[in-house]
């Protein structure tokens, strides 16, 4: 299967005029001619960036464009191969993340780095704990400091709760509070809203505006255009490891940014084709999981894309996990082609032709220390490529390479560790893993979370093509344009129950939000 995206070379006339260059006195952070290479990949090539005091500077670019690599260099995680970093006009050499923190640079990573079995307060003040006269940790003072920090940021989380008990969104807020606690001059946020609800995003933006008013320089990596126009003063675009340009957010349009990011025009963001809808493949009736969701009923047909919408905590992901046997339902009925089945494990679900892309690629998707081949073959090795106890390595590698090309995975090759890839390319590998199983039913939980605009269009085109081949698709998404643009019908959930199923022709953002808040 091939993915077609109309490419048009970008000319200089497509690029908006650059914003004014910041003066030396208000430049908090400057990057000059930085380059960085990894085995087989040039991650950064002569990159330049300036961040002014009291501004939010957004970074935009496709996955693999070099944004996160540059931020890790600024935060002391990686050392540049060449180039220079300046803080307040003075050149610096960073000798690790702790050195960067001591110099006033804090970073909130895209993949959260909290200790799950430590409390919230312990995570925030780790290696900076207040101590009593005996040299022991003063837990009362630790709690007081955390409460004061949370009060300042309007965060409602118990300081003594273990991090492992928190939702992903709450963990993200703890990471943000931890970064703020260092009182850093430069704060780097890498996709900070990827797991947040709309309410939590607005809360985060209030915090960012507060920090901006205090004169902080904030670097904000995002793929979301709406966020750029709402919160950013300036933005820089990266493409293929190079800085394309810096502009005032008020000077450009959405189409300008897309052309700068991908170097081409994307003619159709949601290429949903009208395909014949077949017979019911999956029928769910009164499915329940005690304390999580109840009485969930719906049908899914061959060739149909059934979108699932709802606010964070509505139970959407839990239903997907129950269908795939990750956390089996406590009651209810699942039928495949009219036959009642019991799905208690993922292995059983796979035997019935089901595939499941989880929402958390780091914890439940990728084997981070293994290469692309191992990650892609994980679901098919024993079932499709074993003969008399021997693995048909040639056929396996050939199919994985073909899938990698189809999905346009950017990597040095199949033997590159997946942890070295950008989040978007990791997501493509996981999608490839499940497509190799040739599923009849494909469950996608946030398939384009953390994906750049070009890759989103490719994945949307792929999903539409799969539906055209008769695959039944259940697609969970928190992005309203994606749900409205890609779905034949939309099932809406609120507090663990289905509040309505809307046909494509009757669906609107207002209608879906009404059902999601019932």
From Swiss-Prot:
Top-level taxon: Bacteria
Keywords linked to the UniProt accession: ATP-binding, Cell inner membrane, Cell membrane, Membrane, Nucleotide-binding, Repeat, Sugar transport, Translocase, Transport
Biased composition (Polar residues): 12-22
Region (Disordered): 1-22
The EC number(s) this enzyme carries: 7.5.2.11, 7.5.2.7
Subcellular location: Cell inner membrane
InterPro entries: AAA+_ATPase, ABC_carbohydrate_import_ATPase, ABC_transporter-like_ATP-bd, ABC_transporter-like_CS, P-loop_NTPase
GO cellular component: plasma membrane
Membrane topology: Peripheral membrane protein
ABC transporter domain boundaries: 29-265, 275-515
Record's catalysed reaction(s): D-ribose(out) + ATP + H2O = D-ribose(in) + ADP + phosphate + H(+); D-galactose(out) + ATP + H2O = D-galactose(in) + ADP + phosphate + H(+)
Membrane-spanning intervals of the chain: none
Residues in coiled coil: none
An example molecular function term from Gene Ontology annotations: ABC-type D-ribose transporter activity
Annotated binding of ATP, by residue: 61-68
Task of the protein: Part of an ABC transporter complex involved in carbohydrate import. Could be involved in ribose, galactose and/or methyl galactoside import. Responsible for energy coupling to the transport system.
Family matches, as PANTHER family: CARBOHYDRATE TRANSPORT ATP-BINDING PROTEIN MG119-RELATED, GALACTOSE_METHYL GALACTOSIDE IMPORT ATP-BINDING PROTEIN MGLA
Record-stated family: Belongs to the ABC transporter superfamily. Carbohydrate importer 2 (CUT2) (TC 3.A.1.2) family.
Protein name in the entry: Putative ribose/galactose/methyl galactoside import ATP-binding protein
Organism annotation: Ralstonia nicotianae (strain ATCC BAA-1114 / GMI1000) (Ralstonia solanacearum)
């Amino acid at each position: 299967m091939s993915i077609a995206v109309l490419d048009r070379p970008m000319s200089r006339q497509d690029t908006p005029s650059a914003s004014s260059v910041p003066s030396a006195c208000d430049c908090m952070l400057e990057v000059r001619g930085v380059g960085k290479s990894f085995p087989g990949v040039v991650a950064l090539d002569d990159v330049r960036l300036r961040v002014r005091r009291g501004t939010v500077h957004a970074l935009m670019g496709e996955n693999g464009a070099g944004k996160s690599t540059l931020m890790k260099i600024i935060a002391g995680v990686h050392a540049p191969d060449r180039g220079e970093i300046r803080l307040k006009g003075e050149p610096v050499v960073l000798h690790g993340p702790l050195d960067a923190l001591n110099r006033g640079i804090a970073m909130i990573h895209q993949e959260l780095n909290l200790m799950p079995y430590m409390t919230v307060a312990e995570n925030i003040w780790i290696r900076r704990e207040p101590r009593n006269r005996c040299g022991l940790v003063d837990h009362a003072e630790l709690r007081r400091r955390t409460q004061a920090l949370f009060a300042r940021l309007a965060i409602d989380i118990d300081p003594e709760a273990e991090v492992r008990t928190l939702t992903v969104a709450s963990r993200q807020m703890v990471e943000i509070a931890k970064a703020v606690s260092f009182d850093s001059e430069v704060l780097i946020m890498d996709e900070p809203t990827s797991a947040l609800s709309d309410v939590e995003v607005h809360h985060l933006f209030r915090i960012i505006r507060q920090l901006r008013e205090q004169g902080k320089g904030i670097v904000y990596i995002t793929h979301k255009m709406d966020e750029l126009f709402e919160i950013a003063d300036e933005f820089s675009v990266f493409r293929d490891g190079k800085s394309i340009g810096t502009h005032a957010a008020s000077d450009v349009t959405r189409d300008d940014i897309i052309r700068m990011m991908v170097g081409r025009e994307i003619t159709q963001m949601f290429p949903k084709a009208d395909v014949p809808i077949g017979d019911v493949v999956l029928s769910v009736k009164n499915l329940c999981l005690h304390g999580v969701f109840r009485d969930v009923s719906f049908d899914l047909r061959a060739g149909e894309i059934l979108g699932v919408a709802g606010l964070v905590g509505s139970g959407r992901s839990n239903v997907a996990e129950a269908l795939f046997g990750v956390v089996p339902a406590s009651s209810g009925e699942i039928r495949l082609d009219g036959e009642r089945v019991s799905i208690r494990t993922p292995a059983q679900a796979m035997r019935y032709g089901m595939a499941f892309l989880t929402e958390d690629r780091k914890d439940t998707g990728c084997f981070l220390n293994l290469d692309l081949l191992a990650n892609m073959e994980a679901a098919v090795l024993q079932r499709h490529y074993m003969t008399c106890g021997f693995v048909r390595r040639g056929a396996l590698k050939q199919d994985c390479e073909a899938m990698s090309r189809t999905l346009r995975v950017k990597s040095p090759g199949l033997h590159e560790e997946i942890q070295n890839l950008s989040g978007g390319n990791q997501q493509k590998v996981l999608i490839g893993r499940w497509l190799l199983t040739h599923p009849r039913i494909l469950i996608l939980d946030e398939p384009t979370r953390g994906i750049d605009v070009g890759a989103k269009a490719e994945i949307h085109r792929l999903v539409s093509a799969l539906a055209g081949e008769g695959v039944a698709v259940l697609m969970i998404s928190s992005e309203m344009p994606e749900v409205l643009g890609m779905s034949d019908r939309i099932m809406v959930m609120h507090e663990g129950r289905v509040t309505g199923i809307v046909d494509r022709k009757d669906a609107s953002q207002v209608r879906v939000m009404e059902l999601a808040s019932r």
